[in-house]
């Protein structure tokens, strides 16, 4: 129906069976994909490997931060950091998408943070990675008393940059469109 979502990010799950040791694969991936956020979960029957520049949740004491990424441009000889910033700021689609994701993440944080503490500490900056420039913001807040880690995860997940906006109606649309639930994704 018209008007149910502003943006939807559909994905496809891939599975592979391989003789490659998951830990070896993770180590190789970490060397070639220099993403600051990476993890590996190894179970008896499966492994989950993730490498991403995006940080959905960081908690230190009563402080929580999130760093949404909405905007990516490939590095090349003509695209440096200053040109990337100009590209993002002058591209209406990139700016609107970034604002939408930042607003959604601030709203999610407001459910678990003390009133008036959710603030943008870095707004619309360009971060440089090996092959890409990303358009990022950093949001901080102070967690309310009696909020448990599971409450934080429930409030913040899934992140807006991987599903779209608004969160609840977009999740409902995704559940009807995608062949499998995203689970760990």
Short names for language-model regions:
Residues 1-185:
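Extended alpha-helical targeting/anchoring segments
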């Amino acid at each position: 129906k018209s008007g149910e979502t502003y943006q939807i990010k559909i994905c496809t799950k891939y599975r592979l069976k391989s003789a490659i040791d998951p830990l070896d694969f993770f180590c190789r991936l970490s060397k070639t994909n220099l993403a600051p956020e990476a993890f590996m979960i190894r179970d008896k029957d499966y492994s989950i490997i993730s490498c991403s520049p995006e940080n959905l949740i960081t908690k230190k004491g009563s402080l929580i931060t999130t760093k949404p990424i909405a905007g990516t441009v490939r590095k090349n000889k003509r695209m440096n950091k200053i040109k990337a910033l100009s590209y993002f700021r002058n591209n209406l689609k990139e700016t609107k998408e970034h604002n939408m994701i930042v607003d959604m993440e601030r709203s999610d944080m407001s459910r678990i943070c003390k009133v008036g503490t959710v603030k943008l500490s870095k707004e619309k900056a360009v971060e440089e990675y090996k092959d890409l420039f990303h358009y990022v913001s950093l949001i901080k807040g102070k967690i309310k008393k009696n909020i448990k880690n599971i409450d934080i995860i429930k409030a913040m997940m899934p992140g807006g940059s991987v599903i779209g906006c608004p969160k609840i109606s977009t999740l409902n649309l995704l559940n009807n469109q995608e062949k499998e639930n995203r689970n760990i994704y």
